[in-house]
């Protein structure tokens, strides 16, 4: 049974992170449309590569709209690699007045080079020389405006598999011939997966269309439990894809992590992130880290950072017809998390944060679904987006109160007994008064008695 991730403080410009313990023609599906052929393989591209990029809302604006804790990616991939110290020449034509930003490099929070470098562009000719090199991306902030970008020299094409466009044979040919770039990418409508060449070659025998369809299914499971059904503008999915990146290193005891803009996976995790069977049957870590990019801030006190994230992990398991991790039998006790947590109810000194283990803490969140329907969490996410209450990272009491009051409002019942008396959540006197003021009836069934 995989351990949950633990939060870590801000120490670099990418911001707060959470960690899990324990070519050019390929980019059309992601928003940038290529209009010229790939360049030669072994040296910076000799022929121009032209792209049309369409503007999207900024990642921070999307985070605020979705009431989430972390920003998602706003990168639009080009399928190109810029060698270190090589002048990159490109021309920009802003069709609708907006000029894109160029980014070069890979995300790698714990590595030597931690993040891509940004280069604001101007209309007309531009030359950029990046000291480190890396995959090339563009961003264009807006709402559907377009810009045309022509890469004239200074790049080489990366091997790229794009779902629905690239055949497996073509991708394998790219891996064999496009050897100048040390990076490889897999693209789908909601996915960018950036791998080192060595990492990609480890599992080159996989069915990459099936792999990307599976990743898209997992992303869809997270969107559905989040109530991102497009019923109102505020309930649209985030603009652009999610970015999964192979990283060079993680701290001892860390398996993978999530932070603003991407999920990071070391090579040791690729057997579960880039193989169909591994991701389908042992991919909890990816489900979990992607969940961090969906967590809403309003009801996520520090003590729940590694708990509410698994609302999304469980949703992925159900979507993939996996048995729930909450039903895993602890070999030491012979009991599931439902059973071991129930045995603690009513004991002296019981506190939610200190008395229950990682999976036991997840049990009450699952019991709310069992009691009040599969649409419980989608409805709660929607209400939080529509009201968008604000809280500072330090206001843990406020966010615990929000969890209890929003849950009671969605259920239509007073859940004081469930949260305070049974599970011993730290709901303060203000929170108990807020619950009382809702004037809701008692639930007909005690949710704490329910199990999968």
Q: What label would you give each PLM region?
A:
Residues 18-38:
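N-terminal export signals
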Residues 318-327, 369-379, 408-418:
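Structural helix-adjacent loops and short alpha-helical linkers that scaffold large soluble proteins
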Residues 40-159:
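Beta-strand-enriched, solvent-exposed domains that form extended recognition/catalytic surfaces
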Residues 356-391, 395-401, 410:
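Active-site neighborhood of glycoside hydrolase catalytic domains
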Residues 182-371:
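Catalytic cores of extracellular degradative/oxidative enzymes
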Residues 133, 137-225:
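Fold-level signature of zinc-dependent metallopeptidase catalytic domains
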Residues 2-3, 40-49, 399-452:
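Beta/coil-rich, acidic/histidine-enriched accessory regions frequently appended to metallopeptidases
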Residues 1-14, 24-30:
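N-terminal secretory signal peptides
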């Amino acid at each position: 049974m995989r351990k949950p991730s633990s939060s870590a403080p801000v120490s670099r410009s990418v911001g707060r992170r959470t960690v899990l313990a324990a070519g050019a023609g390929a980019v059309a599906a992601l928003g940038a449309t290529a209009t010229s052929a790939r360049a030669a393989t072994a040296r910076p591209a000799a022929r121009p590569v032209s792209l049309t990029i369409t503007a999207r809302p900024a990642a921070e604006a999307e985070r605020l709209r979705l009431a989430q804790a972390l920003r998602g990616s706003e990168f639009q991939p080009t399928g190109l690699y810029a060698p270190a110290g090589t002048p990159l020449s490109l021309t920009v034509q802003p069709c609708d007045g907006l000029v894109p930003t160029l980014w070069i490099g890979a995300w790698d929070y714990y590595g030597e080079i931690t993040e891509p470098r940004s280069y604001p562009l101007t209309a007309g000719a531009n030359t950029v020389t990046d000291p480190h090199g890396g995959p090339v991306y563009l961003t264009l902030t807006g709402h559907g405006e377009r810009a045309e970008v022509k890469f004239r020299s200074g790049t080489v094409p990366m091997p790229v598999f794009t779902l629905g466009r690239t055949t497996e044979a073509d991708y394998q040919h790219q891996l064999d011939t496009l050897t100048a770039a040390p990076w490889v990418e897999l693209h789908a409508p909601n996915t960018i997966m950036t791998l080192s060449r060595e990492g990609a070659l480890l599992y080159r025998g996989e069915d990459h269309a099936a792999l990307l369809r599976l990743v898209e299914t997992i992303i869809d499971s997270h969107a559905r439990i989040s109530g991102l059904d497009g019923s109102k503008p505020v309930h649209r999915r985030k603009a652009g894809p999610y970015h999964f990146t192979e990283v060079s290193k993680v701290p001892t005891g860390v398996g993978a992590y999530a932070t603003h803009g991407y999920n990071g996976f070391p090579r040791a995790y690729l057997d579960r992130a880039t193989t169909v069977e591994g991701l389908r049957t042992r991919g909890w870590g990816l489900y979990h880290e992607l969940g961090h990019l969906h967590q809403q801030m309003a009801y996520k006190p520090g003590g729940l950072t590694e708990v509410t994230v698994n609302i999304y992990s469980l949703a992925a398991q159900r979507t993939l017809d996996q048995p729930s991790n909450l039903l895993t039998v602890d070999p030491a006790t012979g009991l599931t998390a439902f059973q071991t947590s129930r045995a603690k109810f009513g004991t002296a000194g019981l506190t939610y944060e200190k008395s229950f283990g990682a999976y036991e803490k997840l049990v009450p969140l699952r019991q709310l679904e069992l009691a009040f329907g599969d649409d419980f969490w989608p409805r709660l996410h929607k209400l939080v987006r529509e009201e968008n209450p604000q809280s500072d990272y330090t206001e843990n009491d406020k966010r615990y109160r929000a969890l209890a009051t929003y849950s009671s409002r969605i259920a239509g019942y007073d859940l004081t007994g469930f949260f305070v008396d049974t599970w011993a959540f730290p709901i303060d006197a203000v929170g108990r008064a807020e619950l009382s003021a809702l004037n809701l009836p008692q639930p007909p069934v005690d949710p704490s008695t329910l199990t999968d």
